[in-house]
Amino acid sequence: RCFTDETKVLLSPDGTVIADLIERSICRIKIGDHVVNKDRTATNKVTFVEEHEPSDKDPDLFSPNENIPPFATTNHPLFVDGEWVAVDVDQYPWLGKQRPLRDANVELINGRRLLNLWVSGDGTYIVNGFGTHSIMYDGGLLKNCYNQGILTHEGVMKIMRFYMDERSDIVTGAFLFGRLMG
């Protein structure tokens, strides 16, 4: 899913990686902001902000480092030491192979709000010093429907929850359809 709202995102005020970069809480990121990609070689434009209210279906939180409090859901990949890692590596096959973290710092989510960014370019950004993937890239069809007023923000989130919570068996097909049509 996503990240806790106090998670820090690395931003570029002018859309370049040579600018003075700043960190901002993910809950303060807006569509149109430029985030730094996982490799710090380019910026990606934020196209949509996922906001998930607390749910009993939310996964636990993790951090790949025992010195950092857990901030990412266990199924959200992070780019650590040159490879993609997560606690639950089976949910997003279109992202490629991820190494399962067995010694992650894990805790219960305890009803926290979760957020994620959909971004242009390679679909990545940096949270709390680690690369991550938007999972949805720029959002494809769902983003276009939102931008054209066909779907509200809540409508987009309802579709996301349906495929993630109720029909995870076809989430890959739904993702590919959205990319193709977007």
Predicted features, each with a name:
Residues 1-182:
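HINT superfamily self-processing domains
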